Amino acid sequence: MVDEDFAWRLARELVRIDSSDPGAFEDEIERHIKGLIESQVAGLGRPALDAVRIEELEVLPGRRNLMVTVPGLSDEPRLVYICHMDTVTLGDGWDADIPPLGAIVRNDKLYGRGACDMKGGLACAIAALVHTLERVAAEGELPRRGFSLICSVDEEDFMRGSEAAIDAGWVGSREWVLDTEPTDGQIQVAHKGRTWFEIEMAGVTAHASQPWKGADAVAAMAEAVCSLRRAFAALPAHDELGPSTITFGQIEGGYRPYVVPD
């Protein structure tokens, strides 16, 4: 059985490490996880010790993916856990009783930045890896099916860590992949993709008393927003994933209330 107490302790350790994105990013937490796993691997006897692979992949300066692989005795597809190490920014709303990096436990609930997304899931995946390594050490042989843990960077931004892992051949379509993102305990078999885009409108400035002499870039953007919302509403829904959605997360424009924005 996986050691639940170990998973709890590890989750608290991970929450206490700032890996906000943007912010501290993943350098410290990646080194912490790597050191923990290296100490576990060091306790294996040969030939298992020689078989286990620990690999790093620098995706961005100072931001490394980490993969640990326990090879299997058969050629069956590996089981691959993939988890991201970064969190969103620490943000506001915390206090002295529950600080963002406090890892406070109350009523069997862990509080802190990233406790849910996804250091709790990351700790569970590492605990599964450690359990596998302990089984290998106790039984003196590798498992029938290979096992890999991938800890990725940049999930909260452009997911360049996951893309780099795929491009490097760390994971492919043949493997069985489990992502321990929070889903309220519901097993999900797919999720929506995403596309980020920027739109820039160019207008012609004029005084607000004579707007017909200019071209209002903000008004043009409003038309574009409404048009895109109507277009998305008309798209067919997916049987598993539901309808496509669009969100306009940020709009900037204008100079002063008395000037037609360009």
Predicted regions mapped to residue ranges:
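Acidic/histidine-rich catalytic neighborhood of metal-dependent amide-processing enzymes
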Residues: 118-192, 196
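Generic secondary-structure signature for well-ordered alpha-helical cores
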Residues: 16, 38, 42, 134-137, ...
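Structural motif
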Residues: 77-80, 108-109, 148, 175-178, ...
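Active-site metal-binding loops of divalent metal-dependent hydrolases
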Residues: 19, 85, 155, 182, ...
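Midchain, well-structured core segments that form catalytic/ion-binding scaffolds
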Residues: 163, 167-262
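Acidic/His- and Gly-rich active-site-bordering loop/insert found
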Residues: 1-113, 137-143
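Short, conserved micro-motifs enriched in small and acidic residues
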Residues: 108-123, 134, 215-218
